[in-house]
């Protein structure tokens, strides 16, 4: 499996660094005919009489009981649970030439109220508290019943990953912005690959084929309203939508859509948020595109909240894609350091606020021509990322996305930071650290934090990148996709993960993506397995 890990990482790396060429191709391509295309940003959903009903193919080339589209956290979780619920023949389709999607390059942090690391430290937490945090951060746009179902599934899902999949976590607990308490666990290698790798092995054990380079061209919904299968292209070569051999696959029970978001699709994301031009990089792998968002809408799936698109506030402009600098900016500087505007030498945001607040603050300063940096000293680094993600600092320094300075004066000179103002900012942090009181921006001092002042000093430049789509297909708490015209579940169609909306609202809290995908994938898989065969 070491060879598999290396090949997948090499594949993702090569895709990320050829992104400009790929996206130029995507920008020239028309995903669908003009009759099916969502023409403007105001068309968030199709109208009732626009929901397509498709003629059945003359013959089906093959059949399965359940077809799962997407091989990330959500898709593999859905497939496993469906198979274990005696669904019969379950298959997973992946359009790219390696499995995992964004899940492979995920940071491996998983929000779990009541996890063993919390219990060991005496941290009191509950599904209700996590739900409250999510609803507050999401500005009330999250659907309470969906959030409740997901948060109650958090600890059982964590235990499932450990006991059934064999996923390994370290013994640390972390806190992302917007969470009331530290509650996320870290995978042993600090990457979502630890989970995907174990999910793939589990799928193989269960006899679930994960078929690569299979592009879903059409979701086939019959005149009776039921989804009955897919038109696909086998042997697809990303991003050429006309490549591959057309085949029809019958889904006797259900199709489960786990195709993820569209962060890498500049044209489509600009329909929903015109500000997110190609000037914004994305943390997503290039396959995070819009074709199944468009297709699910075409057949009557209700798209909700698609204009809520999250930018990661902690990324660096000195590397492509997700990169590694964020683990310093968030893991060290946001928790036990400071973020400053280099033009003023002052903090400009609560470093533990939710991602939208922080990203908006960085972008506002960037638009003024100001550089913003995340800053921490040696003590902060030793207390945080050196423990939670061993060896990550070496990688960050090697890639020159985190920068090391012997003295604070050297750092200030490099970034033209007014030294007096910077020293005053650090003194203010140290005052609140000594008193144990929140600062003027509302940041609570992280438990165990020490005063800042022990060189050498480290920093990374901040530049938000498109990260996560909070909107998507409307589903109920069982994972059933809701029809735009009837407000009832579309028979035979389920969805989970980033392809769905109503879970996070306006803002997704960090570490809740893994929870969302795994928990809701499992829920959708179990429910889909209960469907009766239509033929």
Q: How would you label these PLM feature ranges?
A:
Residues 237-244, 250-319, 514-523, 527:
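Glycine-rich loop(s) and the adjacent beta-strand/alpha-helix scaffold that form part
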Residues 60, 79-81, 247, 385, ...:
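C-terminal structured subdomain/cap of oxidoreductase catalytic cores
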Residues 34, 89, 95-209, 213-218, ...:
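Conserved N-terminal/central alpha/beta ligand/cofactor-binding core
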Residues 17, 21-39:
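N-terminal secretory signal peptides and thylakoid transit peptides that target proteins
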Residues 421-507:
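A glycine-rich dinucleotide-binding beta-alpha-beta segment and adjacent secondary-structure elements
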Residues 293-417:
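An anion/pyrophosphate-binding glycine-rich loop and adjacent beta-alpha core
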Residues 221-248:
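Conserved beta-strand-loop-beta-strand element in the redox core of flavoprotein oxidoreductases
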Residues 66-91:
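N-terminal Rossmann-like FAD-binding beta1-loop-alpha1 element of flavoenzymes
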